[in-house]
């Protein structure tokens, strides 16, 4: 079950970068505008202000050990997925001695990775024209894992595994098929491959976009 991402209040935020200052002053008012101006997310508070209704879900909690002079040091490692269920998605990892701190670090990491997801109706079996699926087939690879996401007709649902279903739901996708290769049980590479696939929705320019680029 996803939970709401904690955010900082605008009046409590003291920007440390030029981009942050522009947002604080109201010169950039949306995440869409930030990406259109090709500006990076350099502070997690930027996401708090521009995307205040994010939700996250914990995908994996593990324990990692490191050998030190004082003996073995154990820490929690957390993997989360994050999105606003309306076209923005991310994932993040965090390590700490305390689980709560590891989750906070993962949330902060995910905020810095937020990307837009292009949605559409790309299945030849569906002509509704609504943004319920993907506009075309996309793929992503991380390590040995490769994920291919395919547009599905309206009403199909997310015909994917449980981990991927959570991720795609947070992106606002409703109807998708998938093909996977490699060690999908390694959740971090699995999610990263899916993240790269969704990132690729904006790397391909369709004929519809040609007029917008003039």
From Swiss-Prot:
Q: What is this protein called?
A: Small ribosomal subunit protein uS5
Similarity annotation: Belongs to the universal ribosomal protein uS5 family.
Q: What is known of its domains?
A: The N-terminal domain interacts with the head of the 30S subunit; the C-terminal domain interacts with the body and contacts protein S4. The interaction surface between S4 and S5 is involved in control of translational fidelity.
Q: Does the keyword Phosphoprotein apply?
A: no
Function of the molecule: With S4 and S12 plays an important role in translational accuracy.
Annotated S5 DRBM domain ranges read: 54-117
Kindly give the Pfam families that the UniProt entry links to this protein.
Ribosomal_S5, Ribosomal_S5_C
HAMAP family from the entry?
Ribosomal_uS5_A
Checking NCBIfam families in the record gives: PRK04044.1, uS5_euk_arch
What binding partners and quaternary form does the record give?
Part of the 30S ribosomal subunit. Contacts protein S4.
Biological process terms from the Gene Ontology for this record are: translation
Protein encoded by which gene: rps5
Return one GO MF term: structural constituent of ribosome
User: Can you quote a single GO CC term?
Assistant: cytosolic small ribosomal subunit
Q: Which of UniProt's keywords are assigned here?
A: Ribonucleoprotein, Ribosomal protein, RNA-binding, rRNA-binding
The answer to keyword rRNA-binding applying to this record is yes
Family annotation (PROSITE patterns)? RIBOSOMAL_S5, S5_DSRBD
Mind telling me which PANTHER family this protein's record contains?
Answer: 40S RIBOSOMAL PROTEIN S2, RIBOSOMAL S SUBUNIT
């Amino acid at each position: 079950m996803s939970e709401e991402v904690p955010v900082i209040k605008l009046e409590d935020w003291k920007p440390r970068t030029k981009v942050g200052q522009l947002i604080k002053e109201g010169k950039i008012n949306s995440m869409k505008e930030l990406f259109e101006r090709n500006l990076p997310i350099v502070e997690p508070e930027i996401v708090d202000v521009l995307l205040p209704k994010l939700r996250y879900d914990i995908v994996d909690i593990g324990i990692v050990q490191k050998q030190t002079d004082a003996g073995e040091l154990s820490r929690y490692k957390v993997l989360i997925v994050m999105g606003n269920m309306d076209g923005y998605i991310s994932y993040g990892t965090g390590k700490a001695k305390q689980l709560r701190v590891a989750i906070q670090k993962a949330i902060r990491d995910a905020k810095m990775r937020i990307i837009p997801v292009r949605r559409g109706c790309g299945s030849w079996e569906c002509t509704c024209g609504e943004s319920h699926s993907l506009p075309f087939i996309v793929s992503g690879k991380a390590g040995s894992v490769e994920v291919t996401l395919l547009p599905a007709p309206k009403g199909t649902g997310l015909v994917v595994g449980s981990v991927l279903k959570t991720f795609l739901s947070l992106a606002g996708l409703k109807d998708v098929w998938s093909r996977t290769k490699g060690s999908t049980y390694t959740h971090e590479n699995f999610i990263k491959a899916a993240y790269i696939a969704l990132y690729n929705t904006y790397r391909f320019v369709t004929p519809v976009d040609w007029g917008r680029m003039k």
